[in-house]
Amino acid sequence: MLLSEVNDGGFRSACTAWLGDRDVVVERLATDAFSGSAIVRVCNGDPGGDLVLKSFPAKARPRIAWVHGLMASLRAAGCREVPAVVSSRSGGTVVEDGCGRAWEAVRFVSGVATDEPSVRQARAASAAVARLHLAAAAWPAAPPRVAVPPAVTRRIEQAGRMLSEPWHSVATPGGEVTSLGDAMAARLVQATAIARETGLSGALQRVMAERAMPTMLQAVVRDLWSSHVLFTTDEPTRVAGIVDFHAAAGDTPATDLARLLGSWCRGPAIPVDDACREALAAYESIRPLSAEEHRLVPWLDATATIFGLDNWFRWVLVKGRRFECSARVLERVDRLVGRLPGAVAWLGGLQGPV
């Protein structure tokens, strides 16, 4: 579709900020299934590559600028997997469209994501993350510091809330019942039965008893899902890009490893346990983990399963939040439900989820 054919004045205004009056070809890649942001590829014929424009609420502008500073610093340090942030014609990297949205433009990264990596892909991904972490630790805007990881504190607090408001007390909101709400309610029943059978309340009590140890914190990606790591199509064991840094914040690097390893499928076709061990070994060949970081990777993975489910149940069934792509939401929830018994068992000391 040509830009002139797009029925969105705000988006056309944003494109003009980067491209002037050129009538370029645009391709809607997606609307982020979880944040609602519009994501559009702009095929502009630039030798540097196509652009990807993404929208945010205008109030997020300071936050976006912080993320852009991090991304620029990482690329300057040699992390070429990080997409290049492109400045507008006025020189800024964030543009407001007059319709309540702020926009960014980054270079399009061509690649393929996988949630069933080969061992070589797992090693390549983790090595790229290790290099990214080393570079992020040198960013002057967010120097490393020692403190209790926010990820740990949040989980301890959420365990307390879940014990006081368990899943069987979750009710659907009044008013219209959505198909997503019906589907989520069915999964809540399933997860509640698993929780009862596996002793989830005991696992939550162990989380509340967690001794939150201070460790090194730095800028990390935090939302490092398998879908955000792209491999080249002609050389599938080489990382082409790591995309979407907009959840980045100061936390323990263990959060990125736990999220990435935890988002890989654990099916019989791929020896994922071996892949996880090899991934950690590849990471440590570049950036050795401290003893506390080692301990936190599986702990954060197991607890993310439990609290991720809790978030989805309450977002949909209590707060009545809507999401554009229900199928993707349910796919993620189904995976979490499938992992719930293993996560509870690991917290009970029976086996590890990674």
Regions found by a protein language model. Give the residues of each.
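Active-site activation/catalytic loop segments of kinase-like enzymes and analogous catalytic loops
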Residues: 253-288, 303-321
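Active-site acidic catalytic loop and adjacent metal/ATP-binding pocket
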Residues: 34-53, 85, 198-255
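A cross-family kinase active-site recognition segment
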Residues: 116-186, 215-217, 327
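Juxta-kinase regulatory segment immediately upstream of eukaryotic protein kinase catalytic domains
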Residues: 1-25
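Protein kinase glycine-rich loop
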Residues: 28-33
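All-alpha amphipathic helical-bundle segments outside canonical DNA-binding/catalytic cores
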Residues: 289-301
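ATP/Mg2+ or Mg2+-diphosphate-binding catalytic cores
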Residues: 146, 150, 161-170, 177, ...
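ATP-binding pocket architecture of kinase catalytic cores
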Residues: 47-143
